[in-house]
């Protein structure tokens, strides 16, 4: 094997400085910037006043925002995917080395070429592929060297054989030449004699011919003169005859005319005769017809009778003949058999007699021979016994001598073989040692030569690059300056037609690659080129013109089983189609491979040998496209689509499901996923590279579009192509035909200006194009065509539902159609670094071998004796086979004869009928005979020219026999050129490997959560995976993984160690970095068999995420043997509560809300709320940011809760009215609510829940909880469905008597994390009704409370209602005055008035001024028996008052004092069914001195409030002095010093007493009420 010395320069390379240095170095100096958290992350009850940065989420626990990433983490992630160094890979070359040795031995010139650098394999598959390529290359080289060696050996042998053969052939050719020369000379002499005789005969014949020719020519001239004379006479006679014939014809035609007239009259008369004859004939014919019918019937009967008789007669005669013949034949056969039998038996008897004689003679001969045999046999046996005894004696002497010789030789051989074995052992040790020296020398030489060759190549490259560097740098800087200037101009013109709306330089030069090499892999089916050609041939109109038009291809011709092949086959206008044209490239050569895909299947195309493509001036070596037939494609007529993949990647693909029938509501889309690679076979990471999306046609029945793409759409100003709903197409107009559907130009070329825009070289091709700005190593875009009505509404101009072909040709390239887009063609050059020259090795000297021992001389073995052959025994005679006599033939049997048949009898015939007689017909008169045609004279016969006499035949000069060609002297064949000594070349290959790594992020259930959401406090695991180590790798001496963790991630060292067996795990708290080093046992496993791949172990980091709205990004570094380092991909997970999260569009702040609403659903936060009103609290359970969450089952089991910390001093809960619904109003089940009077009254589980969420309730609270957290998570949380809780609460009635503010706050708890709502504040106004006593309606008049009212005096109770402040929450439904007066002292007159106490604003904007009479808006009820008057505002009036308006009214009840005494009175003001008592008024009526006898006043009927009467001012009678002895007329006899029963001397409790009295006595339940909201 060719050994290659392993050289690791890692310790001095950039790997140590960049990869490890970035992590390990930063880890040593990084300063932790993450707040230290308690071990129990859910316990947050610390009272320390620590200033922290919060997230914008109203979190109650763990509110801190995520800190800045550590320097180590930032630097590591910035270098994600980067690699330094590589691991060498060895591949065996034993067969190649042997082939080289054999070639040298055969004399072949062997040259070792420079070692082939196979580069660096970056994946296991690529590594295996490259190792296979090297093995294949070695095998191929060995095979070629073997073939060359064998061929050369055969050529040497063949050369010698050919030389001998040619010498023999040259001699035979010379002998043959001499023989042919002699025969040639004799033939020449013979031919010359014959030619002289033929020439003399020819000259005599020529003289006679010339004489005969002159005589013939004279006779022909005389004949011509005679013919001319006869011709003149003939022409004169012909003229005379023609004139006479014309005159005769004229006379004949006149006679014919006259004859015709006469015959016409005769014909008329004959017609009458003809009719009479026809009548007579018709009668005769009828009779004749009947006769013939009768006759025919009789004849038929006779014929049938005759036929029957003849048939029977014939059958009889045939049968008679057959019987007679059969009997005769039988008789003749019998007689012949008797005769033959007699003859045969006579012959047999004679033969049997001869057999008897032959058998007797044979027996006598046999007996004599047997006697002689027995005598000869006895003599032979005696001679053989004597010979055998002599042989046995000689054999015994031979065997004794042989044994002696063999033992002597065996002893000599054993001694020799031992000496040989000893010699071999010594030399084997020397050879082994020399082989090691040789291998070490060869390895050192190979390594040195490889290094030297590389150094020389690197040095030449360095010198060249050094010389070119200034020019390259200047060219780069000049181009950058030009681009910068161009971008300034583009910015000025970005709104002009054809310019990019977002100016940019094109960093991707990817316009045309006609020489690209294509390879395909697919899970669909590859198609044969012959099948594709056969399918194209059905397009006879184009195919016959040698045009390949994919748009017409009927894919149903590609669906047969034998159309499929296992490997890619190219088709196009090349090979036997060279000179054909295509609609893809006209006369340009176009090649493509074909596949057949079902929906969802894909084909991966790898394009290599790229020559003209660059990114930022850097060469692109390879492009890989994955084309997938989109599952949403709606083509109908087939289930598979054809993809023609062009070898030029910039031409794209042609996709078709067209079967010859256009389809409605159809579509075909291809998803394109692609990656570009540089010359080091590394994916190119694009940074806003522009990809052209062009030729997006839109007709009224079809739209071509791009969708589902990575990157950003860049519009070209003036283009019809735009972006809508994430799709790129002509969004606003058609672009097919000028003037149609807003199209500015016509797509195809015609006479219109600007037409033909749909061509890459059209100046306005930008009209149907746009661009996509892409970033990252891998991008994607889906392109296709769809029926217009599937995208936009049906329209007779813009979108018609006609059929279309489900096919499209599209290309994705860098040919941006916008004008003046500058291209970046120059890569920024890197200053070259000079290589280091290697040192030549010192070679070891091989040791000489021991000489071989001398072979011994052996004795010859004796010659064995030869036994004299035995005499053969004589042959015993065989007894003869005697002949058997033949038996006689049996006599023939006499035949039995048949009887002859009976002859038939004929039936008599019927008689024939009488035949009718034919009538006598009249004879028609003959016509006049036609005139006789004249006899014309015959025209004279023209003279016949006498033929010329033929000229005599001129004799032909004889063909003289040519003299034979003399034989050519043979040219001796040249002896063959000796074979040229061939030269064979061979080389070794070097290969490096870069094992790939991958970081995965999972939740506690092992679910991948990369780029998703998990709840705060969730356990998050990072798995650090490395692909299998390749076969042929060097020994693994170290295997280290370093992971700088994200801030806000609580690392669990113990759990990490448990999950990372096979590694020593350490954690640096200062830099928040964990390091894993493979243990010795793990390294031993890796090194157990270096010739085979080995799977690696992977450690797992375990911890929790602690911040709301945080993004946790992480990658790690793998370092192997200090020779290879690589940084992994970056994984990312986010916690909810982060707006503008690119991975989770629904993510936003977690903000539960609480809003107070009235029953109409209006927001009443901050408004005045009347006692007795119901607050419809609307609690929003904010879950939309959790959409797509992938939290673990452990996190889900922490549950989902909603807490309402309500003010129990002001509100009563209404659990019967609680509702839970989703955002669409659908009722939600599975959520329970429980009310607790205090935290202490709640279960321990609830107390712990609130404590861990850091929520402190003030008193009573409600707890809403998900009954089944897992189902709740599945249905609402993971779907991002927020819930709305309607939680009605009623303001306590007694709270209106004191008034005051009340506050309300709620919390949602998700996964154990709490979030608070805003505080909702409302105020309950204090309602304080007032009562006065007045004598007028003037509100400024004196209040008589506590004063005197005269007997029979009319006065008013002024009832001032409570003030309803402005900005109140509820409409007034009830505002009433209930006065329970003392009917013993007061009499209600039935008159009242109600006035507005202040300005009122109505909902329609009108204003009712203070003091306005509102009596008409009230109703009154009187209970005279119990002394109760109720004045109630009409509800429809109350509801017209604006909520923004205050309200207060007062009512005057007119009373008459009818008794003496002191009377007290309180009224009740009811507001929305809540009663408020007024102050108590007291008045006294003294005994009048001379009272008039009162006139009884009838109890008045209630007045119609709609027609009020103004109460009259009562007249107070002047008291008269009465006789003191007369009794005083009072209604109730009381002592003057005693208060009435309705009075009291303590009014402090009267409001409550009055309310109780009204409820108990009057029954407020009888007042008109609104129905309860729950009904």
Curated annotation (Swiss-Prot):
<keyword id="KW-0677">Repeat</keyword>
<feature type="region of interest" description="Disordered">
    <location>
        <begin position="1482"/>
        <end position="1548"/>
    </location>
</feature>
<keyword id="KW-0843">Virulence</keyword>
<dbReference type="InterPro" id="IPR019931">
    <property type="entry name" value="LPXTG_anchor"/>
</dbReference>
<feature type="repeat" description="Ag I/II A 3">
    <location>
        <begin position="303"/>
        <end position="384"/>
    </location>
</feature>
<keyword id="KW-0732">Signal</keyword>
<feature type="compositionally biased region" description="Pro residues">
    <location>
        <begin position="901"/>
        <end position="911"/>
    </location>
</feature>
<feature type="compositionally biased region" description="Basic and acidic residues">
    <location>
        <begin position="912"/>
        <end position="927"/>
    </location>
</feature>
<dbReference type="InterPro" id="IPR009578">
    <property type="entry name" value="Surface_Ag_I_II_A_rpt"/>
</dbReference>
<comment type="subunit">
    <text>Binds to human integrin beta-1 (ITGB1).</text>
</comment>
<feature type="region of interest" description="Disordered">
    <location>
        <begin position="52"/>
        <end position="86"/>
    </location>
</feature>
<feature type="signal peptide">
    <location>
        <begin position="1"/>
        <end position="38"/>
    </location>
</feature>
<dbReference type="InterPro" id="IPR013574">
    <property type="entry name" value="Glucan-bd_C/Surface_Ag-I/II_V"/>
</dbReference>
<feature type="repeat" description="Ag I/II A 4">
    <location>
        <begin position="385"/>
        <end position="466"/>
    </location>
</feature>
<feature type="compositionally biased region" description="Polar residues">
    <location>
        <begin position="1539"/>
        <end position="1548"/>
    </location>
</feature>
<dbReference type="GO" id="GO:0005576">
    <property type="term" value="C:extracellular region"/>
</dbReference>
<dbReference type="InterPro" id="IPR026345">
    <property type="entry name" value="Adh_isopep-form_adh_dom"/>
</dbReference>
<dbReference type="InterPro" id="IPR041324">
    <property type="entry name" value="AgI/II_N"/>
</dbReference>
<dbReference type="Pfam" id="PF16364">
    <property type="entry name" value="Antigen_C"/>
</dbReference>
<dbReference type="Pfam" id="PF17998">
    <property type="entry name" value="AgI_II_C2"/>
</dbReference>
<feature type="compositionally biased region" description="Basic and acidic residues">
    <location>
        <begin position="1501"/>
        <end position="1523"/>
    </location>
</feature>
<protein>
    <recommendedName>
        <fullName>Streptococcal surface protein A</fullName>
    </recommendedName>
</protein>
<keyword id="KW-0214">Dental caries</keyword>
<dbReference type="GO" id="GO:0009986">
    <property type="term" value="C:cell surface"/>
</dbReference>
<feature type="repeat" description="Ag I/II A 2">
    <location>
        <begin position="221"/>
        <end position="302"/>
    </location>
</feature>
<comment type="similarity">
    <text>Belongs to the antigen I/II family.</text>
</comment>
<comment type="function">
    <text>Adhesin that mediates binding of bacteria to a variety of host cells. Plays a role in the bacterial invasion of dentinal tubules. A host immunostimulatory component, it modulates the innate immunity response. Plays a protective role against some antibiotics and cationic antimicrobial peptides (histatin-5, HTN3, but not beta-defensin 4A, DEFB4A). Purified soluble protein stimulates human epithelial cells to produce IL-6 and monocyte chemotactic protein (MCP-1, CCL2) probably via interaction with integrin beta-1 (ITGB1).</text>
</comment>
<feature type="modified residue" description="Pentaglycyl murein peptidoglycan amidated threonine">
    <location>
        <position position="1542"/>
    </location>
</feature>
<dbReference type="Pfam" id="PF06696">
    <property type="entry name" value="Strep_SA_rep"/>
</dbReference>
<dbReference type="InterPro" id="IPR032300">
    <property type="entry name" value="Antigen_C"/>
</dbReference>
<feature type="compositionally biased region" description="Pro residues">
    <location>
        <begin position="961"/>
        <end position="978"/>
    </location>
</feature>
<keyword id="KW-0572">Peptidoglycan-anchor</keyword>
<keyword id="KW-0134">Cell wall</keyword>
<dbReference type="InterPro" id="IPR021197">
    <property type="entry name" value="Cross-wall-target_lipo_motif"/>
</dbReference>
<feature type="region of interest" description="Disordered">
    <location>
        <begin position="823"/>
        <end position="978"/>
    </location>
</feature>
<feature type="repeat" description="Ag I/II A 1">
    <location>
        <begin position="146"/>
        <end position="220"/>
    </location>
</feature>
<dbReference type="Pfam" id="PF18652">
    <property type="entry name" value="Adhesin_P1_N"/>
</dbReference>
<keyword id="KW-0964">Secreted</keyword>
<dbReference type="InterPro" id="IPR036234">
    <property type="entry name" value="SA_I/II_PAC_V_sf"/>
</dbReference>
<feature type="short sequence motif" description="LPXTG sorting signal">
    <location>
        <begin position="1539"/>
        <end position="1543"/>
    </location>
</feature>
<feature type="compositionally biased region" description="Basic and acidic residues">
    <location>
        <begin position="873"/>
        <end position="888"/>
    </location>
</feature>
<feature type="compositionally biased region" description="Pro residues">
    <location>
        <begin position="862"/>
        <end position="872"/>
    </location>
</feature>
